[in-house]
């Protein structure tokens, strides 16, 4: 358990409207269902509330922002400082205008694809198969099926650590493979995306194809965090893992998925340490077998056990 600093913080922020909780368990907020508590979990009411909070939060207190926890391992001892979780009520709106889609950071990627399809906007179908939020997509340059966030983003909305509301264009995002280099200097609050006019039947067919592929090759009904490692240039991480003999390998309650080797799963009783140790074991075996250093795609946060 961490020291309770919420009373002091609330006294410094009399106009705060969001919810602030001390020592709040984070495991229920992640897809792996593992990990310790946040010293403080803050859910802002809206963008103005978030900006107010950050302006008044002492600079020495660390912060981390999470969405639905679909690409995340929270370590067993939890996180000191403040974890900010953007909720759909204040950050989940999705609207369309011509060939553009405006989405809050808490909007599910799948919902953005559906909104685009309803407006006959093509090019965003790949979001239909990504199990996260737009905030995470901006943070990670999320992609699937040959498309990435950088391909469709016009601009992102964000709040800086100092509490300034800013707009960042595509170039300013400094996109890399599965990363936006501008983070963690900002917290993304939404984005504007541009697609193209397309026939509704073609859009729906593409979305069905994306969903069918995902259900066929990924363990979507397991406690998992999505793709564990980035694909090395010109190679597939899952093929390297399989060739190293790691399909089905276990550490405690964690297992390399039999269905897709680049997915780790919590079989029911795993700890965060089990999952991270399994991932590091996979990395070591692939390095030994193929000479390739796999890089984590899943984010790992919190104190080491």
UniProtKB/Swiss-Prot annotation:
InterPro entries: FAD-bd_PCMH, FAD-bd_PCMH-like_sf, FAD-bd_PCMH_sub1, FAD-bd_PCMH_sub2, MurB, MurB_C, MurB_C_sf, Oxid_FAD_bind_N
GO cellular component, one term: cytosol
Residues in FAD-binding PCMH-type domain copies: 33-198
Pfam family, one: FAD_binding_4
EC top class named in words: oxidoreductase
Family label: Belongs to the MurB family.
UniProt name for this protein: UDP-N-acetylenolpyruvoylglucosamine reductase
Gene: murB
């Amino acid at each position: 358990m961490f020291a309770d600093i919420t009373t002091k913080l609330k006294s410094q922020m009399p106009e705060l409207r969001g919810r602030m909780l001390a020592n709040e368990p984070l495991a229920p907020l992640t897809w792996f269902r593992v990990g310790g508590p946040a010293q403080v979990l803050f859910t802002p009411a809206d963008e103005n509330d978030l900006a107010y909070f950050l302006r008044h939060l002492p600079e020495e207190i660390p912060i981390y922002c999470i969405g639905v926890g679909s690409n995340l391992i929270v370590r067993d001892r939890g996180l000191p400082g403040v974890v900010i979780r953007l909720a759909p009520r204040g950050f989940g709106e999705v609207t369309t205008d011509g060939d553009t889609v405006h989405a809050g950071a808490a909007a599910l990627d799948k919902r953005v694809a559906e909104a685009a399809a309803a407006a006959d906007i093509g090019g965003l179908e790949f979001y239909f198969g990504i199990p996260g939020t737009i905030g995470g997509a901006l943070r990670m340059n999320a992609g699937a099926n040959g498309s990435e966030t950088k391909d469709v983003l016009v601009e992102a909305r964000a709040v800086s650590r100092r509490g300034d509301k800013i707009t960042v264009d595509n170039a300013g995002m400094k996109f890399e493979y599965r990363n936006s280099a501008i983070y963690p200097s900002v917290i993304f609050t939404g984005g504007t995306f541009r697609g193209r006019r397309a026939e509704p039947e073609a859009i729906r067919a593409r979305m069905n194809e994306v969903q069918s592929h995902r259900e066929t090759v990924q363990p979507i009904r397991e406690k998992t965090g999505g793709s564990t490692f980035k694909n090395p240039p010109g190679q597939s991480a899952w093929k390297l893992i399989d060739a190293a003999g790691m399909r089905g390998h276990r550490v405690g309650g964690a297992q390399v998925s039999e269905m897709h080797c680049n997915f780790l799963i919590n079989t029911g009783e795993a700890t965060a340490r089990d999952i991270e140790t399994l991932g590091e074991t996979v990395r070591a075996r692939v390095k030994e077998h193929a000479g390739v250093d796999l890089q984590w795609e899943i984010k790992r946060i919190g104190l080491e056990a």
